[in-house]
């Protein structure tokens, strides 16, 4: 009703930006006439205009002024380099991103291309633009693919990848546009704030950030803090013993209860007594021999962390599975002893526990950017959160072609068994009709269950989950999920970023064929154990093939033959072999690292100009292969469209409607037909945990067979209600994390600013003298009570304390302070400590000029780092303890804020005092003197 009266706010926003789109379209004709050189020269013109800006506001005004022409230039460059022209809706998306908003664009609408517009415009300032993606593969793909446009126009493009060294990182961050993943940029920020000199700092001050899949980063991962940690030795026997205790305690005997909603386990009085008896201790909380932490973690590991759902065991290691993407996350560990508890439960080696050295949540990290924007297919459901926490508006961009997707109503089964049988049946029917099916499952375990059912029915299918053997083929599987009759099972839709094209993706198939022939010939064998590696077995030492070591792992790039639609013609295959031989001749036999070859294949598969003859030859062959595949695929594409397109099956409602919408969004891309349906059961987690007793009552009421679908308005409403409940619950949790971390964030900003000032060596002496004066003030206040007459002041203790800090004031006596007021004593002490510091500086600098400055930097950084680490632990402990104060009618957050502030002030005082003490005690070794003398 209100919408009709006031008009749709989204439509109003789009209407406001429409004149710019019109301007860009008017400019298109003129820009088309420019030669390549003239087009590139536009970058220089824009930069000259921006150089005139003296303030941020002036810069903003100039950017808006040049926006239509800059966007028209990017559109033309896209046509010339990538043969891709930005549609009008993509221009709108680009404008919205430049405004610092979130653009909601449906799957397949070319979000990646949209980002080139604001990235180029803001890259002109020279202050850096970060384009953030969710994994290394996508960052590399976008930097290579879209980076062509920027490089063609004369902007530098950087890429940050896991495993890069600091020099490479620094070089890539100084580029105009840098592609990276959220975790790499976040960890680099934390590492920069642990650097001991400016050479180690890799990032520049932040400017503008575009996040692809913004909902995944700012909502799904918002509760996950980035943590850099150091190892702490804890006895592994305690974890093993606690795992035995957890196994002995039982939920049925009411030793503990599991709160699945809060993901917590609560011990009952009986449970406490039983655990204490089994451990033969008086008190689980005894500070001398604490057990509570170990037992609680062991119970959580037993009840809440399930193998093949939350983690997998690989090579005797517990590896986390990302609950949102279904991908494994090697190298990531749960903190606070939880990972060790799971290792004890699984009886694998227990790795040492870690202590947090630096931490930040994604929420607070991305708020460090002065301008932030993002793109996703699904943001509207979380609009309130984006606005409240990040101050980001969401604008929905219309699709280029009307969508042809049908969302069919949910079917609900009484039991899970009934549900899975029906899903397998539906897959079989679709396969028979020749329609491709994509089934989204929520865990590795469920995907394997369906795979078994389909196997029994002899239905050919592809399985994509976090298991290592499937990860390597992820994009390959997703790219072929649109073939006629293909059945693909994917866990939580890993593989966002690869399009499902009806009939199959000819470009991707051609690239795979190129890799299959090229990689084994030019990639050097690695000794490390990567994924998808196979042991070379059956080789006897006596006749080992040249270049092979029987123990060495050799990677295979062989693709399952059914992936390719047709066999290559002899002529094309012959040309492919010739091109590979040329590559071997130029690059050497098995001489290049894998990533380098991947990059070369990616460039060969694109249209950007290249001067490298091998790449030109590979590109020529790639285009021939693609053409052969395309001719065949076109027929298949038309057949699949005729059958109704891709059918997407959801096997469980996710906790968030947004994730369901993402799965639905895989069907009906760019106007293609398609359909989606969710199969649910009354035993599904969402209904079980959040649907409450009403659903349990319904289960009794429905006296139906397990494989009979139930359709009921009440049930659908119950489901939607449950989802909204969960969303609100998780939003409240994220908001709480944000509010608590906001307290830490203010402290973090203060300490990092102080640290950076010291690192840059600004006014170090003044800083230390200020510390010394404040320390003197603290001593004066401790021993002088202005309320008492001066005869009762403890001047002798005061002087003694000063001498402990500053031994150079050995001549100071209480008598010198007798007739002075408190204020005068303060001033006198300031003078004394300044003089003492000058003497100390002269002594130290005799050994080596400038040594005192180095000492100041070293001691301040050392104290900041050590005490900040301890402070992080204290804040964690405080956060756990304030939770209990809610029972005492106190607001835990207010308590956390005030006590956290007190702890922070104490830490700052300790830093000051320790630095002053350390510097006055600092006695440079005479040995330094002799070496210094020799080198003169």
Swiss-Prot record:
<dbReference type="GO" id="GO:0017038">
    <property type="term" value="P:protein import"/>
</dbReference>
<dbReference type="Pfam" id="PF07517">
    <property type="entry name" value="SecA_DEAD"/>
</dbReference>
<keyword id="KW-0997">Cell inner membrane</keyword>
<dbReference type="GO" id="GO:0005829">
    <property type="term" value="C:cytosol"/>
</dbReference>
<dbReference type="GO" id="GO:0031522">
    <property type="term" value="C:cell envelope Sec protein transport complex"/>
</dbReference>
<protein>
    <recommendedName>
        <fullName>Protein translocase subunit SecA</fullName>
        <ecNumber>7.4.2.8</ecNumber>
    </recommendedName>
</protein>
<feature type="binding site">
    <location>
        <begin position="108"/>
        <end position="112"/>
    </location>
    <ligand>
        <name>ATP</name>
    </ligand>
</feature>
<dbReference type="InterPro" id="IPR036670">
    <property type="entry name" value="SecA_X-link_sf"/>
</dbReference>
<dbReference type="InterPro" id="IPR011130">
    <property type="entry name" value="SecA_preprotein_X-link_dom"/>
</dbReference>
<dbReference type="InterPro" id="IPR044722">
    <property type="entry name" value="SecA_SF2_C"/>
</dbReference>
<dbReference type="GO" id="GO:0005524">
    <property type="term" value="F:ATP binding"/>
</dbReference>
<dbReference type="GO" id="GO:0043952">
    <property type="term" value="P:protein transport by the Sec complex"/>
</dbReference>
<dbReference type="GO" id="GO:0031676">
    <property type="term" value="C:plasma membrane-derived thylakoid membrane"/>
</dbReference>
<dbReference type="InterPro" id="IPR011116">
    <property type="entry name" value="SecA_Wing/Scaffold"/>
</dbReference>
<comment type="function">
    <text>Part of the Sec protein translocase complex. Interacts with the SecYEG preprotein conducting channel. Has a central role in coupling the hydrolysis of ATP to the transfer of proteins into and across the cell membrane, serving as an ATP-driven molecular motor driving the stepwise translocation of polypeptide chains across the membrane.</text>
</comment>
<keyword id="KW-0963">Cytoplasm</keyword>
<keyword id="KW-0653">Protein transport</keyword>
<feature type="binding site">
    <location>
        <position position="90"/>
    </location>
    <ligand>
        <name>ATP</name>
    </ligand>
</feature>
<comment type="function">
    <text>Probably participates in protein translocation into and across both the cytoplasmic and thylakoid membranes in cyanobacterial cells.</text>
</comment>
<dbReference type="InterPro" id="IPR014018">
    <property type="entry name" value="SecA_motor_DEAD"/>
</dbReference>
<keyword id="KW-0067">ATP-binding</keyword>
<dbReference type="GO" id="GO:0065002">
    <property type="term" value="P:intracellular protein transmembrane transport"/>
</dbReference>
<keyword id="KW-0813">Transport</keyword>
<keyword id="KW-1003">Cell membrane</keyword>
<keyword id="KW-0793">Thylakoid</keyword>
<dbReference type="Pfam" id="PF07516">
    <property type="entry name" value="SecA_SW"/>
</dbReference>
<dbReference type="InterPro" id="IPR000185">
    <property type="entry name" value="SecA"/>
</dbReference>
<comment type="subunit">
    <text>Monomer and homodimer. Part of the essential Sec protein translocation apparatus which comprises SecA, SecYEG and auxiliary proteins SecDF. Other proteins may also be involved.</text>
</comment>
<dbReference type="InterPro" id="IPR020937">
    <property type="entry name" value="SecA_CS"/>
</dbReference>
<comment type="similarity">
    <text>Belongs to the SecA family.</text>
</comment>
<feature type="binding site">
    <location>
        <position position="499"/>
    </location>
    <ligand>
        <name>ATP</name>
    </ligand>
</feature>
<dbReference type="InterPro" id="IPR036266">
    <property type="entry name" value="SecA_Wing/Scaffold_sf"/>
</dbReference>
<dbReference type="GO" id="GO:0006605">
    <property type="term" value="P:protein targeting"/>
</dbReference>
<keyword id="KW-0811">Translocation</keyword>
<keyword id="KW-0472">Membrane</keyword>
<keyword id="KW-0547">Nucleotide-binding</keyword>
<dbReference type="GO" id="GO:0008564">
    <property type="term" value="F:protein-exporting ATPase activity"/>
</dbReference>
<dbReference type="InterPro" id="IPR027417">
    <property type="entry name" value="P-loop_NTPase"/>
</dbReference>
<dbReference type="InterPro" id="IPR014001">
    <property type="entry name" value="Helicase_ATP-bd"/>
</dbReference>
<dbReference type="Pfam" id="PF21090">
    <property type="entry name" value="P-loop_SecA"/>
</dbReference>
<dbReference type="Pfam" id="PF01043">
    <property type="entry name" value="SecA_PP_bind"/>
</dbReference>
<dbReference type="InterPro" id="IPR011115">
    <property type="entry name" value="SecA_DEAD"/>
</dbReference>
